[in-house]
Structures are given as C-alpha cells and as structure tokens.
Amino acid sequence: QSCTMAGIVNAGFATPSDGVNFFFVFSGMQIGPYQLAGNLVLAPMAGVTDAAFRVICLRHGAAYAVGEMAASGSHLLHTEMTRRRYTCDPRERFAVVQILGADPAEMANAAALAQECGAAMVDVNFGCPARVVCGKACGSAVMRDPKLAGDILRAVASAVTIPVSVKMRTGWDEDMKTSVEIAKMAQDAGFCLVTVHGRTRAQRFTGTVNRIDIAEVVRAVQIPVIANGDVTTPGEALEMMRQTQAAGVMIGRGACGNPWLFSRTQALIDGKPDPGAPT
C-alpha cells in the first residue's frame, strides 16, 4: 500500500478574474499501482454519488470518485441498498468504496468485502456529521475517541491488500480538534491518503471552512492530504490548494449539476487555459 505524488511539477494557475496568485502544484497522483492523471476527487454524498453520477464526473475529469457511504454492520451487509453501495461499476478504473462504522472488527470485514467486490481503494468515513450517524458513534463522532479511531484504522489496514484512505473533519467541535492526531495514526497504520473537510462536526455545513486546520494536517504527515469544503469554482479549488498546500481537492456539492468543474480546474492545474462550461 503506497501513495505518492507524481514526480513532474507543473505550473498551476488561475485567470486574473479568479484572484488567485501563481503557484506550483504536483499534477497527478499515484496510489499503489494506479497512476491517476488528476488532483481532483468527487466526494461521497449519500443519495448522490451513485455509479451513474460517479461515471459522469470521471468522464469530466475527476481523478477518482468515492461512492456513497456503505454500512459495515453485519446485519446490514446483505440488504439491497448496502450491497449496491459495495458494487463497483466496471467503467470505474479506480473504484473507491467508503465504509462507515464504529466496530473495528466489523470495519475490517467491510473492508475485505469491498476488496472482494472489486474496489481499488477503501475509504474510512470519519466525517459524516448526520445526527443519525453520529448517534450510533459513527462518522465524525469517532473523532471524539482517538483510541477507537486508531483501532479502526489499524483493523481496516490489516484486512486488505489494496490502498486505504480516511476522510475526516477537523474535529468534533472547536474544543476537540483531533484531525492532526488521527491523520498521524492513519499514516502509522499504513494509510496512503487522508482527506480533510475543513469544518468541525458541530458546524455541519455552516460557517467558514478552516483552511488553516487543513494546512496543519498537511504539515503533520508525509502522505498526501486532500482538502475538502465549499469548492464551487476553479478559482476556489486553486485557492484551496494554494492556502493548504494539499495534494488535491475533493469536490462535493459544487459538482452537482456542474461536473465540468473537474475538467475546468484540472486544466488550470496542468497549465492550460480554462475550457469553460459547455454552452
């Protein structure tokens, strides 16, 4: 399990109207045996990132797309909805299954199932802020318990031979920010990638994304970090990368109805003109 940035440095830039200064980024990512051409990722969104939408975003320039979170509870693994979320579309060259749970053994079994179903990478959900999820001590609620988080990360990494990643928030609330600690645990467990949404669970989707907190995670680990939160334009994506020095950007709600946001932003990262939205 390994993940490194591609060795070629390209100039990433935005147009003057975007208000982003010139800066340098690595173009592309290598995750295990997979060389990915871009730096932009479709975020997992329940009820949105089904196979059809993932393929649309991949065709419009996303490096990879994360499926809807899949439950890890043994009593749920054989339900139709859960099995569908573990299923990888053959059109996805690099399929990613995200698993959700609070029991290390069940999460390990879920990771193994994802690999059996054809996933190229398993992503662990420590980021979902939904009340029904956190009420079961899952999603971002795990960030209140770094010991449990570490146990889950180690169990998942030990259960599969494919790359593993984790998506998290900056912490539970302003008084309990554990993203740096958990990112270090992920790195030590053998995870290849960390994605950070720049809000606490308490914020949910309100308030301002804290790019300083994301940058602290970037500085704390040697594995690539993907930045996430409130990216709806190419300029915002490039500014996120500039301010955080993240390896890439994960785009969620900004891609809904706007999948060409990926190709437009990646063109700028690669030093090419913005092709613009279709007319």
Predicted regions located by residue number:
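Flavin-dependent oxidoreductase catalytic cores
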Residues: 18-279
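Short hydrophobic alpha-helical segments enriched in small aliphatic residues
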Residues: 11-14
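Residues marking helix boundaries in flexible regions
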Residues: 6-9
